[in-house]
From Swiss-Prot:
S-S bridge residues: 733-911
CDD domains per record: vWA_interalpha_trypsin_inhibitor
Occurrences of domain VIT (ranges): 28-149
Residue ranges occupied by any VWFA domain in the UniProt entry: 275-458
Name of the protein in question: Inter-alpha-trypsin inhibitor heavy chain H4
GO cellular component, one term: extracellular region
Principal location class: secreted
Length: 916
């Protein structure tokens, strides 16, 4: 292929599953030149082990050479196993080599003046892969990337994450996710940040006892963001969550092709009491949002302590101080006192990690010596810091040595690194050396939730000193088979290789300690039966257990290398490298070299990134190219996307500005003549469909109302607008006025729903509204900052006006670009939440299908769905009347209000209003 002159090359970043798109001033034309005519994602999950294939087919429609860049995101724990490009019928594969050999080939290319174009960077949950190639006029290119990962169980669920961002309409776009779980699938749910009601028509899910198939295949019209435009609405994450049945307490053993995997997660055990010390950094670098979020999270965590637990707090800056001289029981009184203490923590001073950690160990040792630790309980230390040590002992190696010597294998240490100014490698090694783990807390609006989620992972220990044993005449080798603690909602995984002449039955023994007793499980698995089970399903990729064994072994070897000494570390590295090369995994020890057509840049190298010692992100850029396009002039921040340096950042193709919603959100059945205001002349009903003509599952629109824009009216939106179907008045405006903070808005035990709110009387607004469902057990907490959905102790945060589409058994949760959050269930009342920006701004509650409330509904708002008696109009003033609810009289006044179901600034409506 002839290489065009540099001056004639235009760059297009072709995004499949990507972070961002850089555009030149002719970006729209260039994007149209490079056409993605097919994009498929095929993910096969076989007993937690996911094998994902991304295939993209593109054609250059221009009459000149164009450069296309394949760019995608994959999960952090995944290993790339293959990449190839097919150009003009010729396949150009990626070859996995030892990193040193790949670097030598890369350096030689650099010496020839060629560039290495692969960019790899860590994000919060994903890593980025990128490779570019020049495409001749009318030529077609097929990109294919394969990666594998073991889905870990967190808080009772496995999660498969896919990023979908094509940045243009794709004629053939299809995702297929096949799941096979021999234990049986207990629940399955999907969630998307880009799904609309129109796109949801292209999503299908089928499921039986052991198999599930999720397919997403949208048409071109379903993908369109705007009519007659090429912009796509598909831009974000697609997530599948599920869990499996566990009929046997000893777990599940699965065998295929001479390898086995043992999954262990008993769920019927009682929680072991814990003694936990929270060590909180309050140095000057924590000032501002960090310390505020830390206080917020700590208060929530303290509320979650079990009455059987004991705890204490240590805060440190230049010096460390304890809240109490000894651990105290987590009684209501002590927890409330600790919350008051946490509220007063202020940031200032240096960072003395060494003294704080030694003080924590001394507290536990003192409690142990005085026999204050309950029998059978476990001890945890949780450290939160955002920076490197600056006061006292500042040498990280000495601190690690001091902490290791003090703990002496008696306690588990968990280290949380807040932001990117902390040495993550320092914290990780210190945690791994002491039976715990490290976690980075990303500095963002949901940092407090990240802290709470981490605590939930370790909040409920079920077993300690867990050991797996297999007969030596049956098993040749196994992965890690001893574990210090098993926590509720997680899973222990052991994989191994069987001997060639192994018995027909594989036996396993699992020993562990409960709160007050030891326990032993016995398992037996027939090899031939297991082999047959994995031989038949057509969509299961075979030899997956062998690859799972290799994957898990490599991950554990890399983890052991963190705390190993030189000689041991070299041996671990040699074994991990050998397995990486044998099974074609791109790991931190290997690189993939991408070959390309003659005449093009010959060396592109993919590396597996690791958390950097100081900034949490390793970016492998190679030399920067110049003269090709502005797309090369980029900067990067840790975990972030790409940003233009020479002008306005452009992400994605331009489109028309977001238009105001063409429809009202609430539905009322009737507007009575007595409610009509002279300021509100009759007008045509609102349209009955959303953008693009798509009808919505739940239609919050006002039909037949007569709103008029308010040029001067000093009216505001009420606290709540209640639709009253079947009553003589079709809606009621409610204003909360009485001094009250926590308000029980409505509760219906038959519907299994409760809505509460925190009302700030001084500001006349809700600071939060919370909706709790009994089945499924889901809680939605809405604040002006964001929406938090909690299920199985797992928190997910969403910003207002970010598209959300989550479907779980018995509940659908959606949010559109205007910020309307809908919670809908079959044959139940639909609840909406909205943060309204108009006059009287704040959180608002919306209700539909209120005729479905039962006769047992109650609460400040729920009472109006009992027997309500409306009195006649006041003879002296027809804008007043009385209504009687459950024997209590309320005065109602006909007033002008702003309808918050409209986009701000809202429309004026006439409404009967009551003050509570």
């Amino acid at each position: 292929m002839k290489t065009p002159a540099p001056g004639r090359i235009h760059s297009i970043v072709l995004v499949l599953l990507s972070l961002a798109v850089l555009q030149t001033s002719k970006a729209q034309k260039v994007q149209n030149d490079i056409d993605i005519y097919s994009l498929t994602v095929d993910s096969k999950v076989s007993s937690r082990f996911a094998h994902t294939v991304i295939t993209s087919r593109v054609v250059n429609k221009a009459d000149a050479v164009r450069e296309a860049t394949f760019q995608m995101e994959l999960p952090k724990k995944a290993f790339i196993t293959n990449f190839s490009m097919v150009i003009d019928g010729v396949t150009y594969p990626g070859n996995i080599k030892e990193k040193a050999a790949a670097q030598e080939q890369y350096s030689a290319a650099v010496a020839r003046g060629e560039s290495a174009g692969l960019v790899r960077a860590t994000g919060r949950k994903t890593e980025q892969f990128q490779v570019s190639v020049s495409v001749a006029p009318a030529a077609k290119v097929t990109f294919e990337l394969v990666y594998e990962e073991l889905l870990a169980r967190h808080l009772g669920a496995y999660e498969l994450l896919l990023k979908v961002r094509p940045q243009q309409l794709v004629k053939h776009l299809q995702m297929d996710i096949h799941i096979f779980e021999p234990q049986g699938i207990s629940f399955l749910e999907t969630e998307s940040t880009f799904m609309t009601n129109k796109l949801a028509e292209a999503l299908t899910t089928s499921q039986n006892k052991t198999k599930a198939h999720v397919r997403f295949k949208p048409t071109l019209s379903q993908q369109q963001k705007y009519p007659e435009k090429q912009d796509t609405v598909i831009d974000g994450s697609f997530i599948v969550r599920y869990d499996v049945d566990r009929p046997l307490s000893g777990g599940s053993i699965q065998i295929e092709n001479g390898y086995f995997v043992h999954y262990f997660a008993p769920d019927s055990l009682s929680t072991i009491p814990k003694n936990v010390i929270f060590v909180i950094d309050k140095s000057g670098s924590m000032m501002g949002r960090k310390i505020k979020q830390t206080r917020e999270a700590l208060i929530k965590i303290l509320d979650d302590l079990s009455p059987h637990d004991q705890f204490d707090l240590i805060s440190f800056s230049s010096e460390a101080t304890t809240w109490k001289p000894l651990l105290v029981p987590a009684s209501t009184e002590n927890v409330n006192e600790a919350k008051s203490y946490a509220t007063g923590i202020q940031a200032q001073g240096g960072t003395n990690i060494n003294d704080a950690m030694l003080m924590a160990v001394q507290l536990l040792e003192k409690a142990n010596q005085e026999e204050l630790l309950p029998e059978g309980s476990i001890t945890l230390i949780i450290l939160l810091t955002d920076g490197d040590p600056t006061v006292g002992e500042t040498n990280p190696l000495n601190i690690q040595k001091n902490v290791r010597k003090a703990i002496n294998g008696q306690h588990s240490l968990f280290c949380l690194g807040f932001g990117f100014d902390v040495s993550y490698a320092f914290l990780e090694k210190m945690a791994l050396e002491n039976g715990g783990l490290a976690r980075r807390i990303y500095e963002d609006s949901d940092s407090a939730l990240q802290l709470q989620d981490f605590y939930q992972e370790v909040a409920n220990p079920l077993m300690t000193s867990v050991a797996f044993e297999y007969p030596s005449n049956a098993v040749e080798s196994v992965t890690q088979d001893t574990f210090r603690v098993f926590f509720k909602g997680s899973e222990l995984v052991v994989a191994g290789k069987l001997r060639e002449q192994s018995p027909d039955v594989l036996l396993a023994q699992i020993r562990g300690q409960l709160h007050r007793e030891n326990i032993t499980y016995m398992m037996m698995s027939h090899v031939a039966e297991q082999e047959e089970m994995f031989r038949s399903p057509k969509y299961i990729f075979h030899s997956f257990i062998e690859r799972l064994w290799a994957y898990l072994t490599i991950q554990q070897l890399l983890e052991q290398m963190v705390s190993a000494l030189d000689a041991e570390k070299q041996a671990l590295e040699a074994r991990a490298l050998s397995l990486s090369l044998s099974y074609s995994f791109v790991t931190p020890l290997t690189s993939m070299v991408i070959t390309k057509p003659e005449g093009q840049e010959q060396s592109q190298v993919a590396e597996k990134p690791v958390e950097d010692e100081s900034r949490g992100s390793r970016v492998y850029l190679g030399p920067m190219r110049f003269g090709h396009s502005v797309g090369d002039r980029t900067s990067r921040k840790p975990g972030g996307g790409l940003k233009l340096l020479n002008g306005t950042p452009l992400f994605g193709p331009p489109g028309p500005p977001a238009a105001a919603s063409p429809f009202h959100r609430m539905t009322s059945r009737l507007v009575l003549p007595e409610l009509m205001s002279p300021l509100a002349p009759a007008s045509a009903p609102s349209p009955t469909s959303g953008p693009g003509g798509a009808s919505h599952d739940t239609d919050f629109r006002i039909k037949g109302t007569t709103p008029t824009a308010l040029p001067f009216a000093p009216v505001q939106a009420p606290s709540v607008i209640l639709p009253l179907p079947g009553q003589s008045v079709d809606r009621l405006c409610v204003d909360l006025r009485r001094p009250q903070e926590l308000v029980n808005l409505l509760s219906d035990p038959d519907q299994g729903v409760e809505v509460t709110g925190h009302f700030e009387t001084a500001k006349a607004r809700f600071s939060w509204i919370e909706v709790t469902f009994e089945n499924p057990q889901v809680q939605i907490h809405a604040s002006p900052e964001h929406v938090v959905m909690t299920r199985n102790r797992r928190n997910s945060a969403y910003k207002w006006k970010e598209t959300l589409y989550s479907v779980m058994p018995g509940l659908k949760v959606t949010m559109d670009k205007e910020g309307l959050l809908l919670l809908s269930r079959p044959d139940r009342v639909t609840i909406g939440l909205l943060f309204w920006d108009g006059p009287g701004k704040g959180l608002r509650l919306l209700l539909q299908n209120t005729d479905r409330f039962s006769s047992h509904v109650s609460g400040t708002l729920g009472q109006f769905y009992q027997d309500v008696l409306w009195g006649p109009l006041d003879t002296a003033d027809d804008s007043k009347r009385t209504l009687k609810v459950q024997g209590r009289d309320y005065s109602a006044t006909r007033e002008l209000k702003l309808d918050y179901q409209e986009s701000p600034p809202g429309k004026e409506i006439s409404c009967w209003s009551v003050e509570l």
